[in-house]
């Protein structure tokens, strides 16, 4: 009974989440919040001050840029699945994930996305802008899923982006997702 009461919080209107951890762990935390009955309020960690803070900075006017074979593309349909029916999505917001950093089976089979504002920590510090960008990522995953049996994610982004992306996971839309812990 006590556990049930702590899980459901019928009077709650928002879920406040501050988390640090590996990329797969953060994605998993977000995926536990997919029912959408609570507004999600995410926090990021300030490495200098050593505290969590809300996403209340001014927007950066960021937009997603898609690349395949180092060429700008508009349509992800040009990215083929590998022989195992898998396709990769490299999300480079904090640091750039290069083709040579990927497992060999994903070289030539991975869409690279980044922000037009460059690479840096806490690249999306404003809540609404982050929501908009992450919804676009979710749409890209769904597009890639149409071309493959599985989508593999390689992510270099702030924790809140990863949690938010996990919260948008829908099995019917995204299918099997494999989240890799990418290290630079």
Regions found by a protein language model. Give the residues of each.
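C-terminal functional regions that serve as terminal interaction/effector modules
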Residues: 143-184
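Hydrophobic, ordered structural segments
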Residues: 10-58, 161-162
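A short, acidic, amphipathic alpha-helical segment used as a generic capping/interface helix at domain edges
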Residues: 2-8, 129-147, 161
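Redox- and metal-dependent alpha/beta enzyme cores, enriched for Fe-S-associated oxidoreductases
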Residues: 63-139
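Short, solvent-exposed amphipathic alpha-helical segments in soluble enzyme
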Residues: 32-35, 103-110, 167-171
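Structural motif
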Residues: 18-22, 90-95, 154-158
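Flexible, charged surface loops at secondary-structure boundaries
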Residues: 6-13, 79-85, 143-148
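Long, charge-dense
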Residues: 38-68, 118-124, 176-184
């Amino acid at each position: 009974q006590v556990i049930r009461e702590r899980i459901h919080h019928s009077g709650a209107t928002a879920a406040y989440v501050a988390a640090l951890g590996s990329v797969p762990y953060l994605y998993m935390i977000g995926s536990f919040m997919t029912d959408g009955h609570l507004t999600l309020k995410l926090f990021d960690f300030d490495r200098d001050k050593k505290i969590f803070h809300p996403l209340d900075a001014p927007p950066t006017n960021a937009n997603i840029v898609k690349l395949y074979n180092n060429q700008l593309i508009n349509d992800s349909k040009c990215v083929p699945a590998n022989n195992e029916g898998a396709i990769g999505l490299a999300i480079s917001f904090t640091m750039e994930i290069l083709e040579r950093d990927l497992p060999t089976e994903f070289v030539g089979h991975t869409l690279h996305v980044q922000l037009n504002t460059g690479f840096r920590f806490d690249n999306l510090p404003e809540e609404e802008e982050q929501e908009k960008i992450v919804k676009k990522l979710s749409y890209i995953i769904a597009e890639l899923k149409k071309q493959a049996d599985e989508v593999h994610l390689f992510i270099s982004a702030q924790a809140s982006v990863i949690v938010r992306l996990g919260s948008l996971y829908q099995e019917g839309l995204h299918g099997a997702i494999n989240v890799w812990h990418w290290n630079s």
